[in-house]
Amino acid sequence: SWQLVLDKRENFRQAFAGFNVERVAKFTSNQRKQLLKNRGIIRNQRKIDAAINNARVMTKMHREGHQLCTVLTTLIPQPIVNHPQQFTNIPTQNRLSRNLAKEFKEIGFQFMGPVTTYSFLEAVGLINDHIEDCPFKYTTT
């Protein structure tokens, strides 16, 4: 569940080099084996391999002069603000996340289906699904 991921966030941060894509992209097979033994993270081999792969895809994009942030903000110039009244009204995916997931797959990303892509867009602030009475609904960073 997403809560499990959030509960282990600091362990993931340590295990994946502070989420530095340049460093993760250079992980060796020995480092990968260490991740599979790390009890502080979710030890799913396919997901660990996907994380390393995705870091490599990102660094390739950077070498080619592309930034994911620029690509996303070109597609989504202003955050999408939804107005759910309760948590059960928050979608897990939408047409945008389905289309982006297809594009991510074509680029070479793994484990970035429509639900994960939607959650990613929420996490980076491009989709605001805070319920209406949430104090963070309209805050900006």
What are these regions (language model features)?
Residues S1-T141:
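HhH-family (HhH-GPD) DNA N-glycosylase catalytic core used in base-excision repair
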